[in-house]
Amino acid sequence: WETATTYDVGFDMDLFRNRLSIGFDWYRRYTTDMYTVGVSLPSVYGTDAPKGNNASLKTNGWELSVGWRDSFELGGKAFSYNVKAMVWDARTWVTEYINPTGALGDYYEGKELGEIWGYRVEGLFRDQEDIDSHAEQSFLQTLDKVTRPGQVKFADLNQDGKIDRGAYTTADPGDLTVIGNETPRYCYGINLGFNWNGIGISTFWQGV
């Protein structure tokens, strides 16, 4: 079974007669025996690897909230309102996974969830001389494999004179590198509400 163990430290405080509230938490979560797909099988098998308890993860995250609530008289009746802002973030890495070849298409130890591998862009080719002096990358450009001025120039990270993905493994990624991450970062939420004369409204916005 999948098991999660979380360690958490934080604080909560109320100031100005409980009108101002501040809370902060930092946590680290270890997930073991995560239920997920197994390492990819050769294409000759004609099917995907079965799922199982194949991976372990480590997550670091934090949450911060600041709130204010108060009341005053409006039209002879109490008008109360509250506003609360929250922001949080988390990152997760694979700590265990059976991937003996280090294939980039699967989980591997040290992989950050959501990471995007790709080629680093150096700009655009200015002219034919620029193309001739750069690493060979014609197979990345067009169906006719001809590189032309104005097309994207990719970085030759391993300095082997050609732009490719190598063995597509952690040991030999060719010119591939991590160029981004699709996991949302620095999520936020805002809660606003008021109550007056038996009428109450509460709203919540959330984004990244």
Question: PLM ranges: what are they?
Answer:
Residues 55, 71-182:
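Conserved small-residue
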Residues 181-208:
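Glycine-rich, aromatic-lined ligand/substrate-binding cores of catalytic
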Residues 1-120:
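Extracellular/periplasmic, surface-exposed regions of secreted and cell-surface proteins
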Residues 47-49, 102, 175, 182, ...:
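A near-ubiquitous, low-amplitude feature marking generic local secondary-structure context
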Residues 9-11, 52-53, 177-179, 188-191:
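Generic recognition of flexible, low-complexity loop/linker segments
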